[in-house]
Design a protein with these regions (language model features):
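Flexible, acidic/Gly-rich N-terminal and inter-domain linker regions that tether
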Residues: 1-104
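Short, charged beta->alpha transition segments
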Residues: 93-94, 105-110, 141-151
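Canonical Radical SAM [4Fe-4S] cluster-binding loop centered on the CxxxCxxC motif
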Residues: 99-137
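Core AdoMet radical
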Residues: 122-205, 214-243, 257-260, 285-289
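Non-catalytic positions within long, well-ordered alpha-helices that form the structural scaffold/packing
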Residues: 153, 210-211, 279-280
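Flexible glycine/acidic-rich beta-alpha junction loops that bind and position SAM and/or redox cofactors
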Residues: 226-234, 263-269, 285-311, 331-349
């Protein structure tokens, strides 16, 4: 994908993209070789070209064919240092973690072992804990998390995200979301309740979600081709038309809407043909994520051509064409596998990247 730092600079100049974004796309797509004995790690990266702008990544390791190499101190491309590594740790299933300077809280508050899984999901590769917080524990857990983070309560938290994909039915998801909202209120948080899922789909369910207060639904679309082979059943059974309808119904109820999509699973033409129908029902920038193949088995699901950097830059430019006029813009702190970190359609992207 990238052969050297010189190749990186050549590609960036040819496509008129900043080289840092090109590097990050390739890094997420290729993973890295590493002496660290874990399949997946999270860490802060300071690129040598932008040392004062740290960013956060979660990356597949153990890719012997990657041009990137990572250890506890450095990131190298074809043997040449391109960045420094800080705070590396195993990407296990922590119960909760902060983004955006402790204004955004992500919860893994439901047991992940209930999830049958999608082929691109790294959870089955991890010796991770399997957290599940009982309803009576949620308020106490949030209070403890605040105290351990030097906060008296959660009044300053703008969003609490429930990101586990392990709810078998809509009613079970809504029951848990109501418990999370109650626990938020007990700790002074009146912010947005954000849910990533494919099970919240009915009009009755969306009505119930809207009644929970400020609500944000991220529908886990993921891909459009080969859905039965790639996705778990609850996701695969939703057609693209059905997903657009769900987001439209949610938008009508005042719910913030977007979706997740894995870049690298669909051919570009088919992806764009479907995605253009999502634009009118999307109210915040979607989570476009570069496909991370953690092993050779996962490689077989890449769409032909996506093993090249040129394919990814073509896709990025096509996606920019869909969303440039909407005013919606990506933020790296929301999505550490984004095709955009520092620029979008020639515009500088500002704000936190951790």
């Amino acid at each position: 994908m990238l052969e050297s730092v010189g190749h990186l600079q050549q590609v960036a100049a040819q496509w008129r993209f900043n080289p840092e974004d090109v590097l990050l796309i390739a890094l997420n797509a290729c993973g890295a070789r590493s002496p660290l004995a874990k399949p997946r790690m999270r860490f802060r990266l300071r690129l040598d070209s932008r040392p004062d702008e740290p960013l956060f990544l979660i990356l597949a390791l153990g890719r012997a064919d990657s041009p990137f190499e990572l250890d506890e101190n450095e990131l190298r491309l074809a043997g040449e240092k391109v960045g420094e590594i800080e705070g590396i740790e195993d990407d296990d299933a922590v119960l909760g973690y902060w983004r955006r300077g402790r204004r955004m809280l992500t919860l893994n508050s439901n047991a992940r072992s209930q999830c049958t899984g999608c082929v691109f999901c790294p959870n089955t590769l991890e010796d991770a804990s399997d957290p599940k917080i009982r309803a009576l524990d949620l308020a106490g857990y949030l209070g403890t998390l605040a105290a351990n983070s030097g906060m008296t309560d959660l009044t300053g938290v703008e969003t609490v995200t429930v990101c586990t994909g392990c709810f078998l039915r809509e009613d079970l998801a809504l029951e848990h979301l109501a418990e999370v909202r109650s626990a938020m209120g007990a700790n002074g948080c009146t912010g947005t309740l954000h849910f990533l899922s494919s099970v919240l789909t009915t009009e009755e369910g969306l009505d119930a979600a809207a009644r929970l207060g400020p609500f944000h639904l991220t529908l886990t679309a993921e891909c459009f081709t080969g859905r039965p082979q790639i996705l778990k059943e609850s996701k695969a059974k939703l057609s693209p038309e059905a997903m657009v309808a769900v987001l439209g119904e949610a938008k009508e109820r005042g719910i913030t809407t977007d979706f997740t999509y894995i870049v690298g699973l669909d051919p570009i033409e088919e992806a764009i043909e479907h995605l253009k129908r999502f634009v009118p029902v999307t109210t915040t920038f979607p989570r476009f994520q570069t496909y991370q193949a953690h092993n050779a088995f996962m490689d077989i699901y890449r769409t032909p051509g996506s093993e090249t950097i040129e394919w990814h830059l073509t896709m990025r430019r096509s996606l920019e064409g869909l969303f440039e006029d909407t005013g919606l813009r990506p933020a790296w702190w929301q999505n550490y596998r984004s095709p955009w970190c520092f620029t979008f359609a020639g515009e500088d992207l500002t704000g936190e990247r951790v």
